[in-house]
Each structure stands twice: as structure tokens, then as C-alpha cells.
Amino acid sequence: MAAIPPDTWQPPNVYLETSMGVIVLELYWKHAPKTCKNFAELARRGYYNGTKFHRIIKDFMIQGGDPTGTGRGGASIYGKQFEDELHPDLKFTGAGILAMANAGPDTNGSQFFVTLAPTQWLDGKHTIFGRVCQGIGMVNRVGMVETNSQDRPVDDVKILKAYPSG
């Protein structure tokens, strides 16, 4: 396994070049340092390159980060899963919030989602670790693609390349 970067490595943004355009994500290092490090380092390693947004629910969220494309895969830089970093100041108040997808408490891996609307019922259940700072219109367009009964896009929406700034 590749080395985990030092705590001093804190790129402010991660860029997602997708098949529908570019999304720039601002990372909340102060509130969720372990989660930000995982996401930025996975991006730096090319882990997300070629992966799909495998789950899209209109007016709710777009989800990606699973190299298997099934919604059941993905690992963190720390091993399989790591603990939540829930911060009381961060709430799901609107569109463009970046958070970790999970299967319950302390089950974070590589999957993440971006909200398309307020989703207050997720407060305290998913680690918020950033926001869309450029490309929210593109995120909204991804959120409107046609999906099947399992919320999978009929036509793939891919992350062509993901990389941290700096």
C-alpha cells in the first residue's frame, strides 16, 4: 500500500473532470481532516479515474467513488473502512454539500456523494467534508440524467480524472 501523506499536505481543492464537465470541490480540512486526506490522496493516486456516478437520485444526490460501480466496493487509504468525523457546525442545508457515503456508523471507504437539495435527515449520519465551489450547474445536470429503477444512470456519467490542487 502507498504511504499516507503527512498531516501538512492539505490541498484546498479536488478537481473532478467528468464526462459532463468539471466540478471543483473545496475540502473542509479543519472539520474533517482524516476524511479530506483520504479523498485527496485517493484522487492523487488516480483511484477515482474512470469510475462512474453509480447512483443518482433527482432532487437528492449524486453518488460516486466506487471502483466496482456497484455501490458495494471501495477502500480507504487507511485500510477497509474508517470512522466518521461528524461536526455539529456542518449540516445538510442545501445543494452542493460533499459527504461520505456509508453503510452505517464508522463505515467510510472511498464512496462519496454531493447533495442536490437540503437533506436534513442526513445530519449526524454522514461525514460532511467539503462543498462544490465551482460547477454546481454541472452537478445539477448530472442529477437530472435518466436512471433505472435502481437509481443507476441509463448512460454512464464518469469521473474521467480526479486530482488535488497544489
From Swiss-Prot:
Its main location: nucleus. Its EC number is 5.2.1.8. Cyclosporin A binds at residues 54-65, 70-71, 99-104, 109-113, 119, 125. The modification Phosphoserine is found at S149. Inhibited by Cyclosporin A. SUPFAM superfamilies: Cyclophilin-like. Disruption phenotype: Mutant mice, in which PPIL1 is truncated at position 102, die before 12.5 dpc. It is found in: Nucleus. Keywords: Isomerase, mRNA processing, mRNA splicing, Nucleus, Phosphoprotein, Rotamase, Spliceosome. Residues 10-164 form the PPIase cyclophilin-type domain. GO terms for cellular component: nucleus; U2-type catalytic step 2 spliceosome. GO terms for molecular function: disordered domain specific binding; peptidyl-prolyl cis-trans isomerase activity. One of its GO terms (biological process) is mRNA splicing, via spliceosome. It catalyses: [protein]-peptidylproline (omega=180) = [protein]-peptidylproline (omega=0). Belongs to the cyclophilin-type PPIase family. PPIL1 subfamily. Involved in pre-mRNA splicing as component of the spliceosome. PPIases accelerate the folding of proteins. It catalyzes the cis-trans isomerization of proline imidic peptide bonds in oligopeptides. Catalyzes prolyl peptide bond isomerization in CDC40/PRP17. Plays an important role in embryonic brain development; this function is independent of its isomerase activity. Identified in the spliceosome C complex. Interacts with SNW1/SKIP. Interacts with CDC40/PRP17; this interaction leads to CDC40 isomerization. Interacts with RBM22. This is Peptidyl-prolyl cis-trans isomerase-like 1. It comes from Mus musculus. The lineage of its organism: Eukaryota, Metazoa, Chordata, Craniata, Vertebrata.
